[in-house]
């Protein structure tokens, strides 16, 4: 499990901090920078882990609604389209 709440979304020069360590997490948490100021929480999991979740097993006060999902999408799109990570590195 990698907690990318503070380190994700390019803050370390990579989109996610784990990319700098040569490992790949089974589960990753995101928040804060993912929404670029809009409160959001997210849990990403590989299929082998996610397949064990059933409706109601996991919830988030700031996850899944249309506003925060649009904000997260726009944030990721801006990071990619504006080559922000190139400038960070």
Question: For each predicted feature, which ranges?
Answer:
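Conserved N-terminal phosphate-binding loop of PLP-dependent enzymes in the Aspartate aminotransferase
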Residues: 1-89
């Amino acid at each position: 499990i990698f907690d990318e709440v503070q380190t994700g979304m390019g803050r370390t020069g990579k989109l996610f901090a784990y990319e700098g360590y040569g490992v790949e997490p089974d589960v990753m948490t995101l928040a804060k920078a993912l929404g670029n100021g809009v409160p959001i929480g997210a849990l990403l999991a590989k299929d082998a882990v996610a397949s064990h979740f059933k409706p109601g097993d996991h919830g988030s006060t700031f996850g899944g609604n249309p506003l925060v999902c649009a904000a997260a999408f726009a944030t990721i799109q801006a990071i990619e389209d504006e080559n922000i990570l190139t400038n960070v590195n």
